[in-house]
Amino acid sequence: YESYCEVWARIMNTMIYSYLSLSNKHRSHPETFRNTFKENMKIEAYHSLYQSLKILTFMDLNFKVITEKSKDNIEICNHLYREKTSVFSYYIITSLLMNNYINFLGWCSKNNNVLLQFKKTPGNLDKYIEFIKDCCKNPHIKKNINKLEKIIGKTDNISKNLKMTIIEIPNII
């Protein structure tokens, strides 16, 4: 459930940031807020994907290897992927969901009794896993991954931080 909670936390952080970043005059205009929020979510989603790809690169893996099921890929993942934390949930899965946040919100609305609270049933967990698998196939996400993998592959000086969010509320207060 880490990825589920993390995505909601980032969406809420982005909503609050978007609201506070507007002048008092613009805060009463829903369309201005909505546009600001969408732009900030794009920034957050791209940052999230960048951070997840840095982790995979560090582990000598890539998105294709961890998402396309084949005997070779399973062996590669079993050999190279090691973690003692929840980095996979907090970074890799969360980045997929952040880059598909509109459908994530729709999924939550459809599959939960209360929007924010995950309905903890085996069937709902299976639906959540299927939703994540669908995110892996999203052409928009794959396109962004390809762009970022090329950038990371060409860059020797990759940022060493693993900040979960690039938008920080203290920067505007």
Language model feature labels by segment:
Residues 27-173:
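Pan-zinc metallopeptidase signature
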Residues 1-45:
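Post-HExxH zinc-binding segment in Zn-dependent metallohydrolases
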